[in-house]
Amino acid sequence: INPWLAFAVESFMCYQIFATRCLREESMKVYTALKNNDLTDARMKLSWIVGRDTKELTKSEVTKGAVETVAENTADGIIAPMLYMFIGGAPLAFLYKGINTMDSMVGYKNDKYLYFGRCAAKLDDFANYIPARVAGICMIVAAYLLSLDAKKAWKIFKRDRYNHLSPNSAMTESVTAGALHIQLGGGHFYFGKWVPKDTIGDDIRQVEPEDIVQTNNLMYMTAVLSILVFALIYLLELLIKS
């Protein structure tokens, strides 16, 4: 097979597993509902993209949930499959996506999927360990390019990047919190059970719907930067081999 044709086919296949467009569309549905002052609809839209209970959330908590989801999934929904695609092509990218999807479906700590879910969660933690950190660093640069507070993003990243039950999720959430001068994290109800969590970032100002838009901008800029970095590494590898 022609190598350029193979690359084109693999790129098209991998495009299907990148969550960039989906994340933006679903989070902006929450944003639109909030701008329309329809908290009930915003809660419902948020419930489509988060695992926490949303029925009793305030406007600020709904906004925070959307921001956290976009920030976290920038790493495991975009940068991770992109990195694995550059390492092992479509097969490795799809293998990663399978692990990530399994974690999303059964990785919660409930009695029904306790052991299988624990295995899925540990696999996902392992698979996302490097991508999450790459995403965090790229997002700090993205914050600078978007004229956000990159210095604060770096500070909160260093301080709060482990303030999460997952070893990876706070990598990009901490950068987002610092860049936007907001506080993320904190406990929530999952399946009717309260789960305490540490906060991420400083409570400098109230979270507002426009932060969803800014987080999407961060997500896209981080994705572009990551593509450039991975492509440069790939080209250097080809040059070395030749």
Residues covered by each model-derived region:
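Hydrophobic alpha-helical transmembrane segments
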Residues: 1-94, 107-242
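Active-site His/Glu-centered metal-binding helix of metallohydrolases
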Residues: 98, 102, 106
